[in-house]
Amino acid sequence: MGSESYWLDTAPAFTGAQLGALPGQVDVAVVGGGFTGLAAARALALKGASVVVLEAGRVIGEASGRNGGQCNTGVAQDYAGLSASLGADKARAYYQAYESAVQSVVSLVEQEQIACDLKRNGKLKLAAKPMHYEGLARTCELIRQEVDAEVELLTAEQTRAEVNSAQFHGGLLQRNGVQMHVGRFGVGLAEAAARHGALIHQGTSVTDWKAQAGGYRVNTSKGSLHAGQ
C-alpha cells in the first residue's frame, strides 16, 4: 500500500512551474501553493498584478491534496443550535457564506475548464438513531424557513435508496454540495494561475521576511526578492 494521497498520486503533472531564478521584485508574494494561495495568485494576476507563488514542496502537496474531495454547504454545528445561539441573521450569513464558497469553486472550474470530475450530488447527513432523525427534522424545517428552501428530509426508505444501507433512520439532504478530484482541480488551478501570469516556484521555502521601504524583503531557500505585499 502506498503512502501518497490518492488525489496526488493520480493528478496530472503541473507543467507551469518556473524553473529559473526568482524575480527581483513583484507586487505580491504568495507563500504556499495550496488552493487558497493559487486562487489568490490567479485573482491578482487577472487584475494585472505581478505575482509570485513560493511553495516549499509541490503545489497542493499538503492539505489541499489530502482530503475527502468534498466541497459542501452547511455549518459544522447544527443549524438550529446555531440560530438559537447567534440569532437568525448571523446563522443565515454563515450558511450563505458556505454556499458562496461552493459556488466560487464551481465557477473556477467552469471558467478555467478544469477537468476534475466535478459532480453536484449534494451532502447527506445521516441519522444513526431515532433521536438523531428528530433533530434533523427540526433543523430541516428551520433551514427551509430561514435560508434554504431546497433542503430535504429523507425517510429511512429514501435514505436506504441513496446509500444502500438499512442502518439509518433517515437523513438531511443539502443539494448544493459538490464532489471532485481535488488533485486534478488543484493542478488545473495552478495551471490557470500560471497561464494568467503568476510565477509559481516549487521547492522554494520561505525562511523569513522583513518589512522595508515600499514592502517586504522575502528570503527563501533559492534567494530573496522584494514584494510590495
Regions from the language model: what does each represent?
Residues 141-145, 166-228:
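Helical element adjacent to the flavin cofactor pocket in flavoenzyme catalytic cores
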Residues 68-73, 136, 169-170:
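Short, hinge-like loop/turn segments at secondary-structure boundaries
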Residues 1-28, 46:
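Extreme N-terminal leader/targeting segments of oxidoreductases
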Residues 46-66:
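Glycine-rich FAD pyrophosphate-binding loop
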Residues 158-166:
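Flexible hinge/switch segments at interdomain interfaces of large molecular machines
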Residues 49, 148-149, 198:
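Short phosphate-binding/catalytic loops that engage adenosine nucleotides
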Residues 26-53:
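N-terminal Rossmann-like FAD-binding beta1-loop-alpha1 element of flavoenzymes
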Residues 74-157:
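Dinucleotide-binding Rossmann-like beta1-alpha1 core, especially the glycine-rich loop
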